[in-house]
Swiss-Prot record:
CDD domains: GlnRS_core (cd00807). A motif ('KMSKS' region) lies at residues 268-272. Keywords: Aminoacyl-tRNA synthetase, ATP-binding, Cytoplasm, Ligase, Nucleotide-binding, Protein biosynthesis. GO terms for molecular function: ATP binding; glutamine-tRNA ligase activity. One of its GO terms (cellular component) is cytosol. It is found in: Cytoplasm. The gene is glnS. ATP binds at residues 35-37, 41-47, 231, 261-262, 269-271. This is Glutamine--tRNA ligase.
Length: 561
């Protein structure tokens, strides 16, 4: 067992500690059981970190199991994507990936056992009729007219279902529990239904498929899971989980434990809503960097360490709440501040001509890759007569608080010289096209010899060697913290969630690798996007800004000011 002093404490770990201390379990065995009907999001990451993390901390094991009981919505592409996401987060499952479909033969046998015990029956009622007979939270359900069919007849009917003798929607196997139960999931739930659908693992072997609630508990038991961790919406279903295992011949009975799901502000995690966003071209796909899918976060430049740290910081409780986006952003900002090499980029360029710098000359200047980590080394950047700076870094006149370049005043260029702005050239609309300056040749790496103070520092790139680049600057996808609660969700989309800028980067970035993280000095953290490979040009995604620009906005929304 891992050092308990180094582990975060929560109610789940307290349960596990008690189980191990009492001898109820000798080891810990968890699982991550996604349904392969979509891509994983940050909420799944919380479950991954919890299940795999607990297994690691207790020297136990964690299975990856695909709950593939609904072939209508499942695809091999989703299976492969889920495997990739789990591995990207840094986790390795026990043995080969499992599939609930691996257990279809056993599941079918357990269904027959329930029939033989008089605890399941085939219902020929329509789906609408079954829904009507189910009752409401305030009214008990009504027994199906097929509820008291004999065991022999039910065995024959279920065999006919299995043999494909009933059409879809005309017959279903239901557990016989209690139609007056205050818990809707216990009112004779369907545990098998007819589906004439090709399955991505079992092919056309089956035309009856078990329901999730019947499959999940049995799969856990067959795999010897000790602690079955799931989100709070399955709390009532725990009664069905236990009922199934209590009424079949199986030795293992895992303990289901529920925890709160992750609700992240300014985004959505519903597969239905995200699919609509994709279909209506509101986002580019499930890996759009504005979506909190694991693929989207990875494309945006989030690291596995930052996602795992986020999941640790939010903790595990039984209380549903909204987690601020700024907490996720703080995790990647903290990570990249330490680990991302620095580089220079200009996103809204205006040209500077240094008139006293020799024409045609260039020099290579040393620039540290990280100001606080000498072990990250340095790189060489080209300095030349013509350079690009950010348009917002120049003013014709400004007050003393503006510590950048002002006409007739000086500023230092990062890792280079002090320059002074002498005059400007504008176009017919008054837009500044060129700033003419002169430089102090004796200020490379040192202060001016006469002791004058130059307070501001700005970044730049050589106009002669810089590479053209596209910058995709991302913001919150929605303008409200909880868009799913809005009546017209799409009206709350942020029209400025993606702003595309054209500019330049230092020449060294021509060799940047896909997904490689950088801090563009004074601008933010960026990574090379996958479109750079397909389009043959430099495209960088903003991962996160240097500072939390939304903190004040969120505070105002909280206080109502």
């Amino acid at each position: 067992m891992a050092d308990t002093d180094s582990r975060p404490s929560n109610f789940i770990r307290q349960i596990i500690d008690k189980d191990l201390a009492s001898g109820k379990h000798a080891t810990v065995h968890t699982r991550f059981p996604p349904e392969p009907n979509g891509y994983l999001h940050i909420g799944h990451a919380k479950s991954i970190v919890l299940n795999f993390g607990i297994a690691e901390d207790y020297n136990g094991t964690c299975n990856l199991r695909f709950d593939d009981t609904n072939p209508l919505k499942e695809k091999v592409d989703y299976v492969n994507s889920i495997k990739k996401d789990v591995e990207w987060l840094g986790y390795h499952w026990e043995g080969e990936p499992r599939y609930s479909s691996n257990y279809f033969d056993q599941l079918h046998g357990f269904a027959v056992e329930l029939i033989e015990k008089g605890l399941a029956y085939v219902d020929f009622s329509s789906q609408d009729k079954m829904r009507e007979m189910r009752g409401t939270l305030k009214e008990p359900g009504v027994n199906s007219p097929y509820r008291d069919t004999s065991v022999e007849e039910n065995l024959k009917h279920f065999a006919d279902m299995t043999a494909g003798k009933h059409e879809e929607g005309t017959a279903a196997l239901r557990a016989k529990i209690d139609m007056s139960s205050p818990f809707m999931c216990m009112r004779d739930p369907v545990i098998y239904r007819v589906r004439f659908v090709h399955h991505h693992q079992t092919g056309d072997k089956w035309c009856v498929y078990p329901m999730y609630d019947f499959t999940h508990c049995i799969s856990d038991a067959l795999e010897g899971i000790t602690h079955s961790l799931c989100t709070l919406e399955f709390q009532d279903n725990r009664r069905l989980y236990d009922w199934v295992l209590d009424n079949i011949s199986i030795d293992c009975h895992p303990q289901q434990i529920e925890f709160s799901r992750l609700n992240l502000q300014y985004t959505v995690m519903s597969k239905r809503i995200i699919n609509t966003l994709v279909d209506e071209n509101k986002v580019s796909g499930w890996d759009d960097p504005r979506i909190a899918s694991i693929a989207g976060l990875r494309r945006r430049g989030y690291t596995p360490d930052s996602v795992r740290e986020f999941c640790r910081r939010i903790g595990v409780t039984k209380m549903d709440n909204q987690v601020e986006m700024s907490m996720l952003e703080a995790c990647i900002r903290d990570d990249l501040n330490v680990n991302a090499p620095r580089a220079m980029a200009v996103m809204d360029p205006v040209k500077i001509v240094i008139e006293n710098y020799p024409e045609g000359e260039q020099e290579l200047l040393d620039a540290p890759n990280h100001p606080n980590d000498p072990e990250m080394g340095s790189r060489q950047v080209t300095f030349s007569r013509e350079i690009w700076i950010e348009r917002e870094d120049f003013r014709e006149s400004a007050n003393k608080k503006f510590k950048r370049l002002v006409l007739d005043k000086e500023v230092r260029l990062r890792n280079a010289y002090v320059i002074r702005a002498d005059r400007i050239e504008t176009d017919d609309n008054g837009e500044i096209q060129t700033i003419y300056c002169h430089y102090d040749a004796d200020t490379l790496g040192k202060d001016p010899a006469d002791g004058r103070k130059v307070k501001g520092v700005i970044h730049w790139v050589s106009a002669e060697t810089a590479k053209a680049a596209e910058f995709r600057v991302y913001d919150r996808l929605f303008q409200v913290p909880n868009p799913a609660a809005e009546e017209d969700l799409f009206s709350t989309l942020n029209p400025e969630s993606l702003v595309i800028k054209k500019g330049f980067v230092e020449a060294n970035l021509a060799s940047a690798k896909l997904g490689e993280n950088f801090q563009f000095e004074r601008l933010g953290y960026y990574c090379l996007d996958q479109d750079a490979e397909t389009e043959g040009r430099l495209i960088f995604n903003q991962t996160v800004g240097l500072r939390d620009s939304w903190a004040k906005i969120e505070q105002e929304q909280t206080t109502g000011s």
